[in-house]
């Protein structure tokens, strides 16, 4: 992700429907530019624990979203992943492709043992992406986050390294 990507990022980050289940947004232009700066600043951290990436449709050379994987607990080799897509690209398999790519990177390059993700119980599309990607729903975190003026539940999904290897084939 680069500074000049801010308009493409802001196209989805400022869309109330896209960010409906997110902890953030809808973004202003300033907030989107700050997000990109934060994402870029983590590239040089040693050790690097955050990887925020642009989702690009290569055939169109178009940025359609962002995703990331973060090493949340290095001692236990645990990380979490997330993604956000421009709604014009929902339902086309990009979310599943991105989630699987992040898992592959997490297990092969970052040597993680466990990768998890959360989603709002109302976000059935994201739950479907996580399940289709090979994650299992482990439970519901009840009122575990304060977001947009209210306590919200999250479904917790995870996959273990030994579960990924056969799933990847």
List where the protein language model places each region.
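Acyl-donor (CoA/ACP) binding surface of acyl/acetyltransferases
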Residues: 1-17, 56-169
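Short loop/turn motifs at secondary-structure junctions and domain boundaries
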Residues: 43-49, 135
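A short hydrophobic/aromatic micro-motif that marks alpha-helical segments and, especially, helix-coil
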Residues: 29-30, 43, 164-165
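Short helix-to-loop capping/linker segments positioned immediately adjacent to catalytic or ligand/cofactor-binding
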Residues: 20, 42-44, 91
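Conserved GNAT-fold acetyl-CoA-binding loop/helix
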Residues: 17-40, 53
């Amino acid at each position: 992700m680069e500074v000049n990507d801010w308009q493409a990022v802001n196209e989805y980050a400022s869309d109330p429907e896209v960010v409906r289940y997110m902890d953030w947004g809808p973004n202003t232009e300033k907030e989107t530019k700050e997000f990109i700066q934060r994402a870029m600043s983590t590239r040089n951290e040693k050790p690097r624990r955050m990887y925020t990436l642009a989702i690009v449709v290569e055939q169109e050379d178009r940025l359609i979203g962002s995703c990331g994987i973060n090493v949340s607990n290095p001692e236990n080799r645990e990380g979490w992943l997330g993604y956000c897509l421009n709604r014009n690209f929902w339902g086309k398999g990009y979310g599943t492709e991105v989630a699987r790519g992040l898992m592959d990177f997490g297990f092969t390059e970052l040597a993680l043992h466990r990768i998890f993700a959360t989603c709002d119980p109302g976000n059935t599309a994201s739950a479907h992406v996580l399940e289709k990607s090979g994650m299992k729903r482990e439970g519901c975190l009840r009122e575990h986050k304060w977001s947009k003026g209210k306590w919200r539940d999250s479904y917790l999904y995870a996959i273990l390294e030994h579960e990924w290897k056969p799933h990847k084939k």
